[in-house]
Amino acid sequence: MRLPQVLPLLLALSLLGACSTGSIPVTDQSHGLWQQRQAPLRDFDQWHLRGRVALFINEEVYNLGLDWIHGRGDNSLTLEAALGQGMVRIRRLGDAYQLSTADGEVRRADSAERLLRQVTGWDIPVEGLEYWVRGLPAPGSPARPEIDASGRLKILQQEGWWIHYLDYDEPDDALPALPRRLYMKRGRVRIKIVIDQWQKAPTRQYENLFPDFPG
């Protein structure tokens, strides 16, 4: 199921110039704040986010809706193309991943990124994004973080990706400060992510959200 190209968001076109940044000085204070932030973010492993993705691959642009439930019993990522052009869901099943489409196609593999690319042509690093979207380096591979004065990730280089953290939500009593806008690039692929809502834990399952969508 290869989905057709849709028109780009005008806002995303202005983002290229907004992502240029110089090196960020690291002070003892900011480094200490960064060290303090990492444990609460790792412990924040039950969450539900909703947002939007603008995906640029060569000359093609896709605008996608994003809904991601990450809980101890369920890890389900749903991407829906604009204008009703299609929907896919990726669910983690132990050490493997299952991809389902709205028209009933189901595939399994040990790589979510490869599954998504094979079925849709989209190049989205799902496995790393599970950590990057919270403002953390993914474990198990070298990373080069740059942090801001508040001890938050400003730029992260990992697995060939450059991840720019453009904005954070303000922390409250229930949640730590979490990314709100990210810009990512690797080769000819550019991804803009806007997170509209964070929740501390899933409140309902996808079976209730999309009752007609195959599991």
For the regions a language model picked out, list residue spans one by one.
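Bacterial Sec signal peptide processing site at the extreme N-terminus
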Residues: 13-36
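N-terminal, post-signal-peptide region of Sec/Tat-exported proteins
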Residues: 58-80
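An acidic-aromatic
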Residues: 74-123
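Solvent-exposed helix/loop surface patches that form functional interfaces
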Residues: 114-150
